[in-house]
Amino acid sequence: MAALLAAAGIPVGARLTVLSALRTMPFEQAAPVDPVVMAKVLDQRVPGHTETTVLGGEARLVSLDSLSGKLQTGKGRILDLHLLPAAKDTLIALIETIDSPQPDSRLSVFDRNWKLKWNFAPTAPQSAPEGSVMFGAMVYTPASATLTVDWREAGNDSITAREEYLLTPKGVKRAKK
């Protein structure tokens, strides 16, 4: 088994799982969900399970599978975690989406110890109306390694533009059309 893990580039005895990544997520990323509440939510492993935070908000497990987990960590805030297998290790991709007034996301990629490797915050498309305020909501599709950004103008729920990127352990590049 050790040889198989080593051949796959996974350090022996240190296999990173979605649950272990969520359990070790620093408070800076998980706030306002403290470690005790996070443990209660994750121990259930049942999507929809909700716990009350120390500030009276709710922490809810939205989804969980072998490569990703999604948590609602407050009203209008979603953390979408994905594991990115890399040559020598597995990285953690964390999409934080705030829904106020429109969904707006940012992507941060960390090593297994939650040390920041790089960030990605796309700029509004050139097709955006001049002077408008644009919000980009990200969705990652692991099967195709595609990061989709849906752009909306402030005050308008309709998608104004859609951009697709390929997400790799080294960075993000625009997908070919």
Q: Locations of the language-model features?
A:
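Beta-propeller blade termini
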Residues: 80-85, 137-139
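Short aromatic loop motif centered on NTY/YTY
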Residues: 117-177
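Short, hydrophobic/aromatic-rich segments at coil-to-beta transitions
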Residues: 66-68, 89-93, 144-148
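Terminal domain-start segments
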Residues: 4-83
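Mid-length scaffold segments of soluble, non-membrane domains
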Residues: 87-122
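Short consensus segments that form the blades of beta-propeller domains
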Residues: 71, 97-102, 154-156
